[in-house]
């Protein structure tokens, strides 16, 4: 499909919505047909391209193989569509990560203190502990209850980007079972 003489040449471009028909019994399949919907997400913004690569790698490493999930496909499609009509926003990436965790059943509980299973208090700060949840903590880098409510509601514009990124990375790392994401190290080298 990559060779210029192939009848599929040009159809398999990154972030383009296509329907593939393939056959084969092993993991290496034979491509039989491509039906492209002509939805082209050719946003060449370096940050959005990195985000696409990161999301694709994340999905490959976190999902079991060969199990279709319509809700996850719709989530992915909405993420890709968001960058075809606007510029890159880190909040969109964080929303995708949080929504992905929810769809996979690893969603974060933003309502209770995991140590004593009580409701969060307004005057307390909370630290996220992977596989456990939020716990009361006096560290300045932690979230207030008001911030956690905003994150739960996906109102991320006023949330500190570094704290939010640390939160999603910790939650996702717990789901990856020690698998590294190469796209993160690649982006660090580029920036």
Predicted features and spans:
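Non-catalytic alpha-helical scaffolds and adjoining flexible linkers that form interface surfaces
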Residues: 1-191
């Amino acid at each position: 499909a990559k060779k210029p003489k192939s009848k599929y040449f040009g159809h398999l471009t990154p972030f383009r919505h296509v329907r593939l028909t393939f056959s084969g019994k092993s993991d290496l399949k034979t491509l039989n047909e491509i039906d492209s919907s002509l939805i082209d997400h050719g946003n060449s913004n370096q940050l959005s391209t990195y985000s696409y690569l990161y999301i694709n790698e994340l999905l490959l490493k976190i999902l079991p193989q060969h199990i279709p999930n319509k809700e996850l496909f719709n989530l992915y499609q909405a993420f890709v569509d968001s960058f075809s009509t606007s510029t890159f926003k880190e909040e969109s990436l964080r929303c995708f990560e949080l929504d992905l965790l929810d769809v996979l059943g690893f969603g974060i509980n933003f309502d209770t203190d995991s140590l004593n299973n009580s409701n969060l208090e307004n005057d307390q700060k909370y630290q996220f502990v992977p596989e456990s949840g939020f716990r009361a903590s006096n560290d300045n880098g932690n979230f207030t209850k008001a911030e956690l409510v905003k994150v739960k509601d996906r109102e991320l514009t006023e949330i500190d980007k570094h704290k939010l990124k640390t939160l999603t990375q910790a939650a996702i790392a717990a789901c990856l079972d020690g698998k590294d994401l190469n796209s993160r190290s690649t982006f660090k080298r580029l920036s």
